[in-house]
């Protein structure tokens, strides 16, 4: 197997078969947390945070350690990036020391520049545009509740709320890669960028999926297999909550809306959740909710992704399955 440097910067960086490989590997890690240890040594992986985090920090820190590596966790305040050092300079330095970079930051251009100057895998742990690691965990969760990864292709998923945010974008692209029927609903002014919708439709045409963007929450949820939402106000916008939340009340996931989905529909939320806002307590704490499985699967999915990317970079086929 020829070594091939691969990064995970947006959801369509994996094709259909590659996404399946990573998800199958994630399920194996769920059954055996020490299934593979590609970083035995220990070799360091730089884990950078420009934004606060609970799930991403804990899952990558624990995950790299369980893969046999050392997670070098650096906050914005503790790095020269926080003082304006060019991304390219930081990338060149980390590339001489670490065996990969995981970065939770703001602009998508920042992770893309990091990857440009790296000879090891770079993983987008969240940007303003995409959240691909979360989508892998979400799809792993569906697969585990629906009989396996092969059954993802038959799923209809619906995302409600701020349809212009990174989660909506990643559901569009990641769902298209999986061959799902993806529905995204939000109010006017909070819909996905046309270029992202176009990319999702192009991929869906290749995988047999479909894409629907609508302002009608009921249309999106009707007969869906899984319903997703996210906070209506992203990090840094909390002071504007009263103003920003007004357009979204028709998209609250409640028992009435869930009743329009299939009777066995799942509910997922990437967290943190605000009960009584984007979702009611009856739903997120109810029998259809799988949010705690979803949160745990961040660990397994990200370990699978790091292992797969490392296998590609080294030309080591044993790390791909």
From Swiss-Prot:
Carbamoyl phosphate binds at residues 53-56, 80, 104, 131-134, 270-271, 298. GO terms for cellular component: cytoplasm. This is Ornithine carbamoyltransferase. It comes from the Bacteria. PROSITE patterns: CARBAMOYLTRANSFERASE. GO terms for molecular function: amino acid binding; ornithine carbamoyltransferase activity. It comes from Bifidobacterium longum subsp. infantis (strain ATCC 15697 / DSM 20088 / JCM 1222 / NCTC 11817 / S12). Its EC number is 2.1.3.3. Its main location: cytoplasm.
């Amino acid at each position: 197997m020829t070594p091939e440097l691969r990064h995970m910067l947006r959801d369509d960086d994996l094709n259909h078969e590659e996404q399946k490989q990573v998800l199958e590997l994630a399920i194996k890690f769920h059954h055996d947390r020490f299934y593979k240890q590609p970083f035995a040594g220990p070799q360091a992986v730089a884990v950078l945070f420009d934004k606060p985090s609970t799930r991403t920090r804990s899952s990558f820190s624990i995950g790299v350690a369980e893969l046999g590596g050392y997670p070098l966790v650096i906050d914005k305040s503790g790095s020269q990036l926080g003082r304006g050092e060019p991304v390219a300079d930081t990338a060149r330095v980390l590339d001489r020391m670490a065996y990969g970079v995981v970065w939770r930051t703001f602009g998508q251009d920042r992770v893309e520049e990091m990857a440009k100057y790296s000879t090891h895998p770079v993983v987008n742990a969240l940007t303003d545009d995409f959240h691909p690691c979360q989508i892998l965990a979400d799809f792993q969760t569906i697969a585990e509740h629906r009989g396996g990864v092969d059954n993802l292709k038959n799923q209809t998923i619906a995302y409600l709320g701020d349809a212009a945010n990174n989660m909506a974008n990643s559901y569009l692209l990641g769902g298209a890669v999986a061959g799902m029927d993806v529905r995204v609903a939000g109010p006017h002014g909070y819909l996905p960028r046309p270029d992202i919708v176009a990319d999702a439709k192009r991929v869906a045409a290749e995988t047999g999926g479909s894409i629907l963007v609508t302002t009608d929450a009921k249309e999106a949820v009707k007969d869906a297999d899984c319903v997703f939402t996210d906070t209506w106000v992203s990090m840094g916008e909390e002071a504007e909550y009263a103003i920003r939340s007004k357009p979204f009340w028709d998209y609250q996931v409640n028992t009435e809306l869930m009743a329009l989905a299939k009777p066995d529909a799942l509910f997922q939320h990437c967290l943190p959740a605000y009960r009584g806002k984007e979702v009611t307590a009856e739903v997120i704490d109810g029998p259809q909710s799988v949010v705690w499985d979803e949160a745990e699967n961040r660990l397994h999915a990200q370990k699978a992704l790091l292992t797969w990317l490392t296998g590609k970079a080294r030309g080591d086929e044993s790390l791909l399955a």
